[in-house]
C-alpha cells in the first residue's frame, strides 16, 4: 500500500541569512522517503529513494504551473528525507535547498514519489515558501498563546471564534494580502489536561477513564491525538503549511502547573502514571514542536536527531533523551534563537529550565541564563530589535506581581512553616508561578534588558512577547536613572482560542488599579518580600477575547496591532482593537 500523509505539512524554518533554505515537517502513515518539490521540478529529481537528505535539481517555477519559468524563479529548489520512527509513527523534517531570495515558491509534498500534498480538490491557495530579500527590509511577526483546538465546524463553539482559524481564513481569501512572515506560538499549543469531548470519547476506547489520569492524556499515542486534533483543522493546516512557525511549550503542553515547585514535582513522581506521562510529553514536544525550531545547521549538529535517524526505530533513543531531560533539566536546552534580518528572536524555556529549591528558586538555571545573556549580547549593533519570547509574562499587573512575590517569600519560609504550607497550596490553586514568583530571575532579566538597551549600539526596541494569562495588554517598564535608551515593552497576547472566567477579568483590571497597587504593596510587606528594582505602567489594554498581536519591524521602526476574532451578521473576521507605533513615544 502506498504511503499517505497523516499530518502536515508544516513550514517550520525559512533562512533569513541567504534566503535559500527552508524546512518542512510531515508525518506519514508508514516508512517512506518524503520529498518537497517546488512547482516545475521534473519528476524524480528531488528524491533519492532510501537515501538521506538531498537537495533536488531541476527547473522550478514560482506559484505557477510546471512549465512556468518566469524570471527570478528558483531553479533546483526542493529536498527529501527518509522518515524516522517514534512509537510507531513516522516523521520527516525535510530540508529544502536552492530557493531564491525575495521569491514566493509553491511546493508539493511527495511520499515515495507519489504526490500527497496538496490533496485533490483542495479549496485553499497553493502552499508557498516565501523567502526574504537579502538583506531583509523588515519582518512581520504574529504571536499569541493558549489555543484549545476548535470544535468541528458543525458544532457550536462556546468560547468564540478561533483567532488562528480566522487569520488563516482571511489569508486564504486574500492570498496576495498581508500575511505574517512568521508565527510565534508562545505555549499551550495543545492541552494535555483539558481534552475535548471528542478526544475523551476516543480515550475511552483505549482505557478506563475512571482510573488516573482519567480524561487527561497518558502516553505518546494520546499526545499525538492532540496534535492531530489541532493541526488537521483544514484552514489551520493550510496556514501552517505556508507560514513559518517558532514554538515553545508552557505547562498545558505537558500538564497544568508543570514544575511549579519542588514539592509538586515530588508528588507527581510518586504517582504510578506520571513517568509515562512526562516522558511522552517531552518526546511528543520534541517531535512536533522543538525539532522544527532548529535551523538546518543546528539539525546537522544535533546528537538526538542523529540518534533517532540512525536506527529503524528511534523510540528508545528519544525516550532516553526525555528521561535525561526530566531527571537533569540543566543538561538539555529547549530555548532557541531565530534571526530575521536585523531582528533577533530568543525563545526562552520558562518551564523545564527552572531551579525549584525554595532557597534558590530561579526561572532559568545558570546554564540557561548564560545562554540567554550570550545570545542577547552577541554582536552589539547587529540588530535593531530584540524579541524575547517567554510563555509567561515578565511584567504582570503590579498587584498580581506583588502577590506572587509575597507568595514566593511565604513558600521559602519568611513567615514560618505554617505560612509556607499555606503559600504552597495557594501557589498551586492560583497559578502563582510567573517571573514575579522567581524574584532573582525577574531582577536578572531586568538587568540584562537594561544592559542590552544601553549604549551607542543599543537596539531600537526590546519587546518581551508573552501569553498564558488569557488577556492582552501592553506595559512599559522604567528604571532608576539612567534609563536605557532602548524602548522596552511587555507585549502580552492570549488566548488564541480559550476563555477566561469573569472573576479573573475583574482581578486583572484590579491588578492595574491604584487600589490594587496599594493592596499588593501591603501583601509584599507582610511576606517581607523586597520591592522590584523597576516600576512599570500599563499603556494598552487589558483586552479580552480570542486574539493575536502582530509586530511590523522595519529598520528601527516598530508598529504593533492587536486583532480579535469576532462574529457578527457578516460572518467571522479579525477586528483591529488597537494599533500603535512603538518607536515614537507612548
Residue ranges: model-predicted function:
Residues 1-64, 68-586:
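Metal-dependent phosphoester/phosphodiester hydrolase catalytic core
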